[in-house]
Amino acid sequence: MVNIPSYVFTVVKRLESSGFQAYLAGGCVRDSIMNIAPNDYDITTNARPEEIKNVFRDFKLILTGEKHGTVAVITNGGIIEITSYRLEKGYTDGRHPDNVEFTSSLIEDLRRRDFTVNAMAYGIHDGLIDPFNGRDDICLLYTSPSPRDKRQS
């Protein structure tokens, strides 16, 4: 279902071979289900930022999101954001959480996401993980034609 580019697969396998869970999450899963080529790939993991940095110590890293649990890994294929499973509280700026608490639960991490269609994960061994029925809700994203289109029919 999700076509995983080799550079993304390599990052997932490296996390797993280091003893961590690793799942594609969010928009890349949603887009793949909708038969849209993802623009980027995000990975969610039970590894904490320090552990992610250690696993990818031989890669160039972007650490601007580290306090929110995100470490970006620069690969030959592109930049992959790896984010620790987390819980969030408060959004004073409307975009970034005021408080982040790491968790060991993939389901808790998915629960914090904005929409059910973004609260899905995909594991290379487990396939689709969809605890909130986001796949069923994808049909809600499709809209009817605009009034202009209807008049031209």
Language-model features: where?
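Catalytic cores of the polymerase beta-like nucleotidyltransferase superfamily
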Residues: 1-151
